């Protein structure tokens, strides 16, 4: 059963290793913080919940300083008797979208681990900064991108699905749905995760819902306040 404690970190890591969609991110607000509730779902999510937290709260933040954008995702769970957490983020150059650093850290049931390293691959960002870029320049048709995961590069496609009504904790919200999937390219690795993103139709394109799927388990994050 040792592999089950790795499922949630892998799912959340999938969330933060998402590419930029190109262009500048100048159009969105300078500093933002979004609060979410999250829950493990699906068959493997239920099984993993026997060994790992099944629900909790999270935050997605975007902070600018000296021409850099710091994006970070943090999740916590009240199921932890200690102050358990998972944290992933990156720092990029706002003007060029060039990645500078990426980091990850977690602490759970007495086990902790952290990593902080420079990122030299052009055009590849963590998912939080990627979401920031999608909000600034929403794709109108399928767009090929790459994701960076622990030094490995994976090709993906970003697919605009359409406008949907989503039921969230504060009520119904009209949102634009985007799906991110791995693609098969000869001699390149295939990303096995799935990511779905719903952006409100407000001026800020608020990220109201995020769904990460991996290893038959789902993590669903829902915005706790009305956009």
Task: Report residues per predicted region.
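Bacterial N-terminal signal peptides that target proteins for export
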Residues: 1-10
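Acidic/charged, solvent-exposed loop-and-adjacent secondary-structure segments enriched in E/D, K/R, S/T
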Residues: 114-129
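Acidic, serine/threonine-rich low-complexity disordered tracts
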Residues: 23-118, 138-227
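Low-complexity, intrinsically disordered short segments enriched for Gly/Pro and polybasic residues
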Residues: 126, 130-132, 138, 143
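Bacterial N-terminal signal peptides
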Residues: 9-20
């Amino acid at each position: 059963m040792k592999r089950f404690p790795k499922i949630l970190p892998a799912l959340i890591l999938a969330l933060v290793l998402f590419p930029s969609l190109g262009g500048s991110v100048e159009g969105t607000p300078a500093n933002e913080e979004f609060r979410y509730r999250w829950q493990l779902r699906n068959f493997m999510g239920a099984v993993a919940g026997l060994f790992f937290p099944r629900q909790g709260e999270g935050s997605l933040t975007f902070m600018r300083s000296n021409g850099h954008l710091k994006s970070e995702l943090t999740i916590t769970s009240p199921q932890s008797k200690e102050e358990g957490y998972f944290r992933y983020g990156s720092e990029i150059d706002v003007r060029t979208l060039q990645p500078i650093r990426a980091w990850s850290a977690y602490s759970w049931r007495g086990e902790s681990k952290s990593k902080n390293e420079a990122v030299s691959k052009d055009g590849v960002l963590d998912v939080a900064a990627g979401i920031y870029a999608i909000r600034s320049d929403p794709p109108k048709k399928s767009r090929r991108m790459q994701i960076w995961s622990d030094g490995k590069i994976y090709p993906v496609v970003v697919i605009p699905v359409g406008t949907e009504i989503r039921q969230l904790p504060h009520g119904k919200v009209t949102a634009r749905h985007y799906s991110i999937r791995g693609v098969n390219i000869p001699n390149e690795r295939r990303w096995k995760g799935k990511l779905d993103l719903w952006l409100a139709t407000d001026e800020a394109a608020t990220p109201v819902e995020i769904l990460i799927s991996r290893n038959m388990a789902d993590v669903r994050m829902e915005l706790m306040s009305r956009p």
